[in-house]
């Protein structure tokens, strides 16, 4: 009977353990141990308290009305089971994270399609070991070295080129400071 009380909150520990990162395994083990201790403590007690034989106590206790008073107080005592206030928040977070997951999946599928297009384009090109400088310039005009149309100075880094402006300079110009 006691297992029925906590059956709804049972956790699939093996599935959860697969998702725990390696650096958090010790914390996960400690959490599982504490949970197991709690479950054992709950299961050690019966769901309902044992029935009290009030008639027997009425025979044994000499003070009249004392057992009746205790019986009324005992039967009037109701220990409230705490309300679950967190499950609705968890469900809301699950729904929110599910929408984020769906958006991430859509974006990932789009990225995969773009990467597959890039792969198809790269496969359609001449192999790099067979390319000349002109072939490379035709295939990748943005990254190819073009000394005739866009000459650069050694060491060919953006910082060393004529007209280069740092991020700070560009931000200052955007704000109107010269």
UniProtKB/Swiss-Prot annotation:
Gene Ontology terms describing biological process: ATP metabolic process; determination of adult lifespan; negative regulation of ERK1 and ERK2 cascade; negative regulation of TOR signaling; proton motive force-driven ATP synthesis; proton transmembrane transport; regulation of mitochondrial membrane potential; response to oxidative stress
Region annotated Disordered, chain positions: 149-178
Primary site of residence: mitochondrion
Biased composition range(s): Basic and acidic residues: 165-178
Gene3D superfamilies for this protein: 6.10.280.70
SUPFAM superfamilies: ATP synthase D chain-like
Keyword annotations of the record: CF(0), Hydrogen ion transport, Ion transport, Membrane, Mitochondrion, Mitochondrion inner membrane, Transport
Subunit structure: F-type ATPases have 2 components, CF(1) - the catalytic core - and CF(0) - the membrane proton channel. CF(0) seems to have nine subunits: a, b, c, d, e, f, g, F6 and 8 (or A6L).
Entry function: Mitochondrial membrane ATP synthase (F(1)F(0) ATP synthase or Complex V) produces ATP from ADP in the presence of a proton gradient across the membrane which is generated by electron transport complexes of the respiratory chain. F-type ATPases consist of two structural domains, F(1) - containing the extramembraneous catalytic core, and F(0) - containing the membrane proton channel, linked together by a central stalk and a peripheral stalk. During catalysis, ATP synthesis in the catalytic domain of F(1) is coupled via a rotary mechanism of the central stalk subunits to proton translocation.
PANTHER family tied to this protein: ATP SYNTHASE SUBUNIT D, MITOCHONDRIAL
Recorded family membership: Belongs to the ATPase d subunit family.
Name assigned to this protein: ATP synthase subunit d, mitochondrial
Originating species: Drosophila melanogaster
């Amino acid at each position: 009977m006691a297992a029925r009380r906590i059956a709804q909150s049972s956790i699939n520990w093996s599935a959860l353990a697969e998702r725990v990162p390696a650096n958090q395994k010790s914390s996960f083990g400690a959490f599982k141990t504490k949970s197991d201790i709690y479950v054992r403590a709950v299961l050690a007690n019966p769901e309902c308290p044992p029935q009290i034989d009030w008639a027997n106590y009425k025979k044994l206790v000499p003070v009249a009305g004392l057992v009746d008073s205790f019986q009324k107080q005992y039967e009037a005592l109701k220990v409230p089971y705490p309300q679950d206030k967190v499950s609705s928040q968890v469900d809301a977070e699950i729904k929110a994270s599910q929408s984020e997951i769906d958006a991430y999946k859509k974006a990932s599928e789009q990225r995969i399609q773009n990467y597959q297009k890039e792969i198809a384009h790269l496969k359609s090109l001449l192999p790099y070991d067979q390319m000349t400088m002109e072939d490379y310039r035709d295939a990748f005009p943005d990254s190819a070295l073009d000394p005739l149309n866009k000459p650069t100075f050694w060491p060919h880094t953006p910082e060393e080129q004529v007209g280069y402006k740092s991020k700070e300079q560009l931000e200052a110009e955007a704000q109107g400071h010269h």
